[in-house]
A protein has these predicted regions:
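Conserved GNAT acetyl-CoA-binding A-motif
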Residues: 94-108, 121
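Conserved catalytic-core motifs of GNAT/GCN5-like acyltransferases
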Residues: 107, 119-141
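Conserved acetyl-CoA pyrophosphate-binding loop and the N-cap/start of the following alpha-helix
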Residues: 79, 83-91, 101
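Short, solvent-exposed loop/turn elements at beta->coil junctions and helix N-caps
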Residues: 31-35, 124-126
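Conserved beta-strand in the GNAT
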Residues: 45, 51-60, 66-74
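Short amphipathic alpha-helix that is part of the acyltransferase structural core
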Residues: 1-30, 38-52, 142-160
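Conserved active-site tyrosine of GNAT-family acetyltransferases
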Residues: 113, 118
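Conserved acidic functional residues
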Residues: 6, 108-109
Length: 160
């Protein structure tokens, strides 16, 4: 398995993967819209030979400054529970550190994301419409950014 940044030639395979994994096109359209808006900061694919078997996206938040949102993460059904998702999350965290990201937020299963260092208590300090036990954050900077509302990019508004 190879994990690398997406290429334009991967876009249709990413769209197909997201549609298949989520059973609808909403997440695939989200990634396309984030890309079109220039908000897609990190987009990695996991490949097995020529097949895209996983994808992770991190997008710029409007607030707090220097923050990213992890969404979506998808692994081909036949490859789930084999470490592909964990490898993508770890690679995305490394990539986020390389671009001086201060904090990453994700709305997801806390039992999954806490093993990578994500923390619900940290996320709870930041006002968000997604506040609750499934809203977690990972601090990458030496100090927490100033507390500010978590405001997602415009592409997320199109999900409603």
């Amino acid at each position: 398995m190879l994990i690398r940044p997406e290429k334009e030639s991967d876009h249709s395979a990413i769209y197909a993967l997201l549609t298949d994994v989520f059973g609808q096109a909403q997440e695939a359209n989200l990634v396309d819209n984030l890309r079109a808006d220039g908000d897609l900061a990190i987009s990695l694919v996991a490949k097995d030979r020529d097949d895209v078997i996983g994808h992770i996206a991190l997008s710029r938040l409007r607030s707090p400054a220097g923050a990213l949102a992890l969404a979506p993460l998808a692994v081909a059904t036949s490859r789930q529970r084999s470490g592909v998702g964990a490898s993508l999350v770890k690679a995305a965290i490394v990539s986020a550190r390389q671009i001086d990201t201060g904090i990453i937020f994700v709305l997801g299963d806390p039992a999954y994301y806490t093993r990578f260092g994500f923390d619900a208590a940290l996320a709870a300090a930041f006002p968000s419409p997604y506040a609750g036990p499934h809203f977690v954050a990972l601090l990458l900077a030496a100090h927490s950014p100033p507390i500010a509302p978590v405001i997602y990019g415009d592409a997320f508004d199109k999900l409603c």
